[in-house]
Amino acid sequence: MNAYELQALRHIFAMTIDECATWIAQTGDSESWRQWENGKCAIPDRVVEQLLAMRQQRKKHLHAIIEKINNRIGNNTMRFFPDLTAFQRVYPDGNFIDWKIYQSVAAELYAHDLERLC
């Protein structure tokens, strides 16, 4: 993974550098994350693995929902959770990363006019 791909995935999941340093790198070291995005330092394998796993989970959710959309008639609506607390009211076992993946999927489907958000 290169610096551009790192930035792209951070944006796809609508995460700040500080959030990525805390939840993905699990170090809280925002400066290191900035260096990775600027291409000044190599991205640690564990960070790459975590992001690729998130990307795969997102892809899996997208495909599952698109399949459901293709098999149903009527309104297509998907919940949009403004914050982690609202997400955890519906998905009590969900964590911050789960919420970001869910929101990314919801935004993608809305952007392609496949789902309405509620």
Curated annotation (Swiss-Prot):
Q: Which residue pairs form cystines in this protein?
A: none
List the coiled-coil residues: none
Q: Which Pfam families match?
A: Aca2_YdiL (PF08965)
Which InterPro entries does the record associate with it? Aca2_YdiL-like, Lambda_DNA-bd_dom_sf, YdiL_sf
Gene3D superfamilies in the cross-refs = Putative cytoplasmic protein (1.10.3100.10)
The lineage's top-level taxon is Bacteria
* Name the UniProt record assigns to this protein: Uncharacterized protein YdiL
